[in-house]
């Protein structure tokens, strides 16, 4: 099938690909035609970003479809890759190590491990549920503790 890939800067190319082609393969073809490195590409179809591991058919992309190409700045790509690498290489936070020591004093090794895993899951779930308002409130309390103390005293009267 014939596809048109249009970059936001105005350049575009036409590509002939099978309907079940991998998005990652399409990105490689775009790289060859438009000289945009694969890692800087973000392909969009009807406003939705295409994932590398999926096929064009997963997004119902048919013949003569038009895809948009967003070119990510190299600095952002390198920063994101560096951050991901640091996170993967970093040891668990010291707090989890301390908690595991405390649990080891009160539970068997197997039970302590299960309790720690459940605690970490609960913690991650709680963090993922925080709204921007919640985060803003927490930040305000840390940045202006005297203001929140006054508000809490006023509310408790």
From Swiss-Prot:
One of its GO terms (molecular function) is protein-folding chaperone binding. Polyubiquitinated. Ubiquitination by AMFR and deubiquitination by USP13 may regulate the interaction between the BAG6/BAT3 complex and SGTA and therefore may regulate client proteins fate. Residues 1-76 form the Ubiquitin-like domain. Residues 96-138 are annotated as: Required and sufficient for interaction with BAG6. It comes from the Eukaryota. The modification Phosphoserine is found at residue 90. There is a cross-link at residue 48 (Glycyl lysine isopeptide (Lys-Gly) (interchain with G-Cter in ubiquitin)). The keyword Cell inner membrane does not apply. One of its GO terms (cellular component) is BAT3 complex. PROSITE patterns: UBIQUITIN_1, UBIQUITIN_2. Disulfide bonds: none annotated. Its main location: cytoplasm. Keywords: Cytoplasm, Isopeptide bond, Nucleus, Phosphoprotein, Transport, Ubl conjugation. One of its GO terms (biological process) is post-translational protein targeting to endoplasmic reticulum membrane. It is found in: Cytoplasm, Cytosol; Nucleus. Component of the BAG6/BAT3 complex, at least composed of BAG6, UBL4A and GET4/TRC35. Interacts with BAG6; the interaction is direct and required for UBL4A protein stability. Interacts with USP13; may be indirect via BAG6. As part of a cytosolic protein quality control complex, the BAG6/BAT3 complex, maintains misfolded and hydrophobic patches-containing proteins in a soluble state and participates in their proper delivery to the endoplasmic reticulum or alternatively can promote their sorting to the proteasome where they undergo degradation. The BAG6/BAT3 complex is involved in the post-translational delivery of tail-anchored/type II transmembrane proteins to the endoplasmic reticulum membrane. This is Ubiquitin-like protein 4A. It comes from Oryctolagus cuniculus. The gene is UBL4A.
């Amino acid at each position: 099938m014939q596809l048109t890939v249009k970059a936001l800067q105005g350049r575009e190319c036409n590509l002939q690909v099978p309907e079940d082609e991998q998005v990652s393969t399409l990105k490689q073809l775009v790289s060859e035609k438009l000289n945009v490195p694969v890692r800087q590409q973000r392909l969009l179809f009807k406003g939705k970003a295409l994932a590398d591991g999926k096929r064009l058919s997963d997004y119902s992309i048919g013949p003569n479809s038009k895809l948009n190409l967003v070119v990510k700045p190299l600095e952002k790509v390198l920063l994101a890759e560096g951050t991901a690498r640091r996170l993967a290489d970093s040891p668990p936070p010291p707090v989890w190590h301390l908690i595991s020591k405390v649990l080891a004093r009160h539970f068997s090794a197997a039970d302590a491990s299960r309790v720690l895993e459940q605690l970490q899951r609960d913690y991650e779930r709680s963090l993922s549920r925080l709204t921007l308002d919640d985060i803003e409130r927490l930040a305000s309390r840390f940045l202006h503790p005297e203001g929140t103390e006054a508000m809490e005293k006023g509310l408790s009267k």
